[in-house]
Curated annotation (Swiss-Prot):
Subcellular location: Nucleus
Organism: Saccharomyces cerevisiae (strain ATCC 204508 / S288c) (Baker's yeast)
KW Amino-acid biosynthesis (keyword) present: no
The name this protein goes by in its record: DNA mismatch repair protein MLH3
One Gene Ontology term, aspect cellular component: nucleus
GO BP annotations listed: meiotic mismatch repair; mismatch repair; reciprocal meiotic recombination
Name of the gene encoding the protein in the UniProt record: MLH3
Amino acid sequence: MSQHIRKLDSDVSERLKSQACTVSLASAVREIVQNSVDAHATTIDVMIDLPNLSFAVYDDGIGLTRSDLNILATQNYTSKIRKMNDLVTMKTYGYRGDALYSISNVSNLFVCSKKKDYNSAWMRKFPSKSVMLSENTILPIDPFWKICPWSRTKSGTVVIVEDMLYNLPVRRRILKEEPPFKTFNTIKADMLQILVMHPMISLNVQYTDKLRINTEVLFRSKNITEGLTKHQQMSQVLRNVFGAIIPPDMLKKVSLKFNEYQIEGIISKMPVGLKDLQFIYINGRRYADSAFQGYVDSLFQAQDFGEKGMSLLKTKSVGKPYRSHPVFILDVRCPQTIDDLLQDPAKKIVKPSHIRTIEPLIVKTIRSFLTFQGYLTPDKSDSSFEIVNCSQKTATLPDSRIQISKRNQVLNSKMKIARINSYIGKPAVNGCRINNSTINYEKIKNIRIDGQKSRLRNKLSSRPYDSGFTEDYDSIGKTITDFSISRSVLAKYEVINQVDKKFILIRCLDQSIHNCPLLVLVDQHACDERIRLEELFYSLLTEVVTGTFVARDLKDCCIEVDRTEADLFKHYQSEFKKWGIGYETIEGTMETSLLEIKTLPEMLTSKYNGDKDYLKMVLLQHAHDLKDFKKLPMDLSHFENYTSVDKLYWWKYSSCVPTVFHEILNSKACRSAVMFGDELTRQECIILISKLSRCHNPFECAHGRPSMVPIAELK
């Protein structure tokens, strides 16, 4: 290999750059549909052939002339801008002249287009020149794709992308191995962004199977009229794209204005198990700061958002084993800057130019919502988060009949989509006023930094299971002493006796870590609970590995799920089967499907006890955990010739066990363990400590609380 610096061949350079700009089928679909929107299309149809990494987009936009078609997909050729300052007032998605150029370098691209009142349509198979489309023209594309001729008064464009990444085989193989639901969910999120900004566009997305025999509707834009308010349109768009993931009356309107900044959106009153339905748009572009998104979600978690719904379930859970997140769409409008448009090829905003104003306003909107819903009490001492205070006089907003009361925010509970309205700024409008000093970005920034530092400290201070860690405060010197106890220490100990019918006092004799023996107090309930929990996990995984897992047939157990959830269950059906959970998905409407539960493991059947809401929650939790890699698939292939389970290291597979099984086994171990107040003989104490010393993680009970604490050094 030459050691001299040389310019890359143009072919290699183009492939590398194109792969960076267009890395997936979903991103290519997004770029083409955005081009259709820029062409003022009112109807857009998308057909996706995922197995072949191909798709087609049909629109009724203004179309292309022959001359424009011949220079289409040429790098840095665009009709959107002429000079840099044009970006400030630009209203279109595209402007770089890069998207089609990149797609054409990694796929077979075909475009056919017609301008209104032109006699002819023109087509082009890249990189060839355009030719006229006639009845006798043989189309240079797969016969699966259909092109209907336009009448003289009509216009439109058809873009067909075939065999994406055909010249990048490794990247193509990786893309083809990606689960279909992930690609479809990405497309849904991208199309939602377009429809939130352009709700009146009729956007229909379909996909075909591997044999191209059957086609399914991914989603269809419908029931959007000009008579709906913006917030009602948002609610319907969300339902159209992601299905009936949340009832419409559970979405509340929020609205806030401060000088040139305005936020309008919807927030759900009830949570869902999916965190992916949280969208913030700034001037129509997705805000992609994951740190801030996490901070916003933490505002809800800190107030136990959704706990009211959990309390309504007939089946109760100990602690908070199941995650829940709000659904929200926030549309932020502010002065547009060139810097915001140049941050990401996918047209996302990573760090907005007006971040010092936008982020505090978003936080204020969230906290106002939480306050009105009763989750949060206004903290007047924290000016960066204080809620907008309105005067006692009532006033009528110009765009509604809602009256502002003495309350911090306004909500009209008579409407299905209620409203929270506030105006911030000088002079006061409708009796609402707040000083600019309350928009304090630095406090939010510090909170985010503190949160990141806290997470880092937790990672750095985490200990492996073979050691326990505690802090002892010296009341005289006011110092902290670190004690580290390994499992090997527990192999050499002496049981002294039971203490107060609650604890077992032991003396650890191993001096390899400490220079002198230690007195350790062991929680007898936590000790027995840990022993029983590990025995239960070993038994459970042994049954799964050996195929002796007991499942019970169910009848008439159907659960309604939305289409997005149905796709998730379809993909992980075989994984659920390993745990004795058998089901079939039944296609329903465009918004909902049915999950027919066929079998459940015996332990889950007893816990479920007819509570379908609880069952849906725990099944969705595991599906989302698998999707987010919080749980790993249970690989049983290397157990096919497994004859002995004596050496089954169960802890290696604990990350595969569904959360609901963890909950059930934790509860079972807790209820059957020795309790506080139970009197134990010294021999019984010896047996307990002996079993604890053989546990994989002897330092925690089933719920994560410490099972022992060092109390003294015997010097």
